Amino acid sequence: MKVGVIMGGISSEREISIQSGNSVVHALDKDKYEAIPIVLNEKEDLIEKVKGIDFALLALHGKFGEDGTVQSVLKTLGIPFSGCGPLSSAICMDKDMTKRILAFGNVRTARWEMVSSVDEIDYEKIENLGYPVFVKPNNGGSSVATTLVESKEAVKDAVLEALKYDTEVMIEEYIKGDEITCPIIDGKMLPVLAIKPKGKFFDIASKYGDGGADEFIVELNEDLHKEVEKMALETYKLLKCDVYARVDMLVKDNIPYVLEVNTLPGMTKNSLFPKSAAGINMSFEELLDTIIEKSLKVNRE
């Protein structure tokens, strides 16, 4: 089977995507698959470069990759692809829409406000959230242009920085707690990982640099584990995820809050999903096998 590993792209996470893609190409079982690296440099590359492949394994991150656009093109071309479909991908990429759906489904998430310009900043509402707050692009990943803002005076600059990457900016309540992540594959939760960033929060340097954070499988107390699993699977279902995704949470005073959902989690040597899979003795190669196998069974009609 010719498996095109699609990486690169046009988002701010291009370099991370290439790291993921190269890791995947090297890990794929050579006896089962002919791995074909497909590096996208511009949108127009996609249709030409996927010709002749039997399956698209997506190692893209960010806009035009994780947002449902590439999935829509592949679906139109009749090429099976890995992971979530166009709708779920688009919803999970939009942090505001994700949180609206979670709130509708009574899944706990941090409070937030949205702005499209500095003129829309409502300092009274931000005061109500309580400082510090996170300021981040609405559509974006890997914590690119995400700032932990300690005071009213710093809000405007943080919003301007985030607006360089998106037309909408989220101002989110800061919940000081323990960060965990819940990888899900085929509707089942893998071992939960704890994330202990060396800096103030799990930023881009922590996520992809060596030693930027301690990440390890964590044994939660029984009641908390049950609630985390229930929330993670409910989130996966509410957002119509398919095959695999990663649900990020914060736990404060034994109460979990959903942060966001990654529909194309990183697949580098430092990535969380492979670390979690290793906790049930699933190798990186076996994880990719499972993703391909389960993705081929999804009805994309």
Swiss-Prot record:
Cofactor: Mg(2+); Mn(2+)
Cellular location(s): Cytoplasm
GO biological process: cell wall organization; peptidoglycan biosynthetic process; regulation of cell shape
Keyword Manganese: yes
Principal localisation: cytoplasm
Cofactor binding annotation: Binds 2 magnesium or manganese ions per subunit.
Entry keyword Nucleotide-binding: yes
List of residues binding Mg(2+) 1: D248, E260
Annotated ATP-grasp domain residues: 99-293
Residues annotated as binding Mg(2+) 2: E260, N262
GO MF entry, a single one: D-alanine-D-alanine ligase activity
Gene Ontology CC terms: cytoplasm
Positions of ATP binding: 126-181
Catalytic activity: 2 D-alanine + ATP = D-alanyl-D-alanine + ADP + phosphate + H(+)
PROSITE patterns: ATP_GRASP (PS50975), DALA_DALA_LIGASE_1 (PS00843), DALA_DALA_LIGASE_2 (PS00844)
Listed pathway(s): Cell wall biogenesis; peptidoglycan biosynthesis
One Pfam family named in its UniProt record: Dala_Dala_lig_C
Keyword vocabulary terms for this entry: ATP-binding, Cell shape, Cell wall biogenesis/degradation, Cytoplasm, Ligase, Magnesium, Manganese, Metal-binding, Nucleotide-binding, Peptidoglycan synthesis
Enzyme nomenclature, EC number: 6.3.2.4
Reported function: Cell wall formation.
Similarity-based family: Belongs to the D-alanine--D-alanine ligase family.
Listed name of the protein: D-alanine--D-alanine ligase A
Phylogenetic classification of the source organism: Bacteria, Bacillati, Bacillota, Clostridia, Eubacteriales
